[in-house]
């Protein structure tokens, strides 16, 4: 059975390559703005990942396992997704500075052969060091934060701001590896 990653994220591709040797990337065209956050972060990221997987699975013509994910940063009751502008990134990074936040990733696997759907969610707590405005501006000028939830990438330059994490590192990158591995064990595909 084919494995399809419903994501254009190079980080998700890199993570999936650790456990699945052969898969295809098919970008989801699901409009994430059609789902509003209503207070339950786990439900929100699961719903987003499920809808991404459904959209891709409808375009496939052969039995496949479709994997989709969605990641958000959550702090003080607010969801921080990808910044819309450099000012938005500055505001996000300023709020993360010196504080702890949580990163939630929802995953969804759809077996197109029998239409079974599996969803799960992981949460990682991240503590940022204090950042001054110059450090934040320099980071924004690198371009790195503009396509990442919460305006930082732990695997890149943004990792320098992280004092500690509690939970799955790969979850912060966008795909909770351990949860995904456990979910994939239920299918007849070669992993590891």
Curated annotation (Swiss-Prot):
UniProt-listed Enzyme Commission number(s): 3.6.1.9
GO BP terms: nucleotide metabolic process
Keywords (A to Z) from UniProt: Cytoplasm, Hydrolase, Nucleotide metabolism
Domain of life, per lineage: Bacteria
Cofactor: a divalent metal cation
Enzyme class: hydrolase
GO MF annotations in UniProt: dTTP diphosphatase activity; UTP diphosphatase activity
Annotated InterPro entries: ITPase-like_fam, Maf-like
Catalytic residue positions: 70
Localization, UniProt: Cytoplasm
Reaction(s) the record says it catalyses: dTTP + H2O = dTMP + diphosphate + H(+); UTP + H2O = UMP + diphosphate + H(+)
Family statement drawn from the similarity comment of this UniProt entry: Belongs to the Maf family. YhdE subfamily.
PANTHER family, alphabetized: BIFUNCTIONAL DTTP/UTP PYROPHOSPHATASE/METHYLTRANSFERASE PROTEIN-RELATED, BIFUNCTIONAL DTTP_UTP PYROPHOSPHATASE_METHYLTRANSFERASE PROTEIN-RELATED
Function: Nucleoside triphosphate pyrophosphatase that hydrolyzes dTTP and UTP. May have a dual role in cell division arrest and in preventing the incorporation of modified nucleotides into cellular nucleic acids.
Protein's name according to its UniProt entry: dTTP/UTP pyrophosphatase
